């Protein structure tokens, strides 16, 4: 892509593969969240009507859970290098009040800030916990009754934590930080957004746009 086209259309934030995988994980999680409420909480049983009925939900929930886990493992492999914490992340954490108050940090942030990395690792841990605790619920014969009850309790607790994290993630991506969503729908963000929220990454992308086209996460110091 030419320098002028890069400036006119915005900066490539996420590749097509990244976007497809992100939305696959997001949509499978949304199904798991809704079906999880239906299965686990009697007052939410009305959700069955929107999800194909109780028998269908109980059949699909663990299968979609496996699909979600596979997608998240692929996402972990894809973004692992970008999600490693560094000195800038510690500085970002110290400047957290400014970020919460203004939606912007004074730290020279790269492609992902410490908050995004923190949420990513939170999702990795809780996703793994949901898969592990979900197995005894899918195959009750794997463990004794007492362990099954513990797995069920942990599954519920981790599920609620994950839902809370998901709500915060959606809020920050839409209401708190306008201009973020286009990066995950069309792949591009404005140059102003990139320079304001991820200045270090923005400078690297600006430099790279003059040369051979590179993947959005390929520019690392």
Regions found by a protein language model. Name each.
Residues 1-221:
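Membrane-embedded alpha-helical bundles that constitute the cytochrome b-like, heme-associated redox core
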């Amino acid at each position: 892509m030419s320098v002028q086209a890069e400036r006119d259309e915005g900066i490539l934030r996420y590749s097509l593969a990244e976007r497809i995988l992100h939305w696959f994980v997001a949509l499978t999680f949304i199904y798991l969240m809704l079906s999880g409420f239906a299965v686990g909480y009697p007052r939410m049983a009305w959700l069955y009507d929107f999800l194909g009925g109780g028998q269908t939900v109980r059949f699909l929930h663990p299968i979609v859970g496996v699909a979600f886990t596979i997608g998240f493992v692929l996402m972990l492999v894809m973004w692992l290098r970008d999600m490693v914490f560094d000195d800038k992340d510690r500085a970002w954490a110290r400047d957290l009040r400014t970020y919460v108050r203004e939606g912007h940090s004074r730290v020279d942030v790269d492609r992902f800030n410490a908050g995004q990395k923190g949420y990513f690792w939170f999702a990795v841990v809780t996703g793994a916990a949901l898969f592990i605790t979900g197995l005894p619920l899918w195959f009750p014969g794997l463990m004794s009754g007492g362990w099954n009850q513990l797995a069920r309790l942990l599954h519920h607790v981790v599920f609620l934590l994950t839902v809370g994290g998901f709500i915060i993630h959606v809020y920050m991506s839409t209401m708190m930080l306008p201009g973020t969503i286009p990066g995950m729908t069309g792949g591009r963000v404005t140059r102003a957004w990139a320079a304001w929220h991820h200045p270090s990454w923005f400078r690297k992308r600006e430099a790279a746009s003059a040369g051979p086209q590179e993947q959005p996460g390929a520019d690392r110091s």
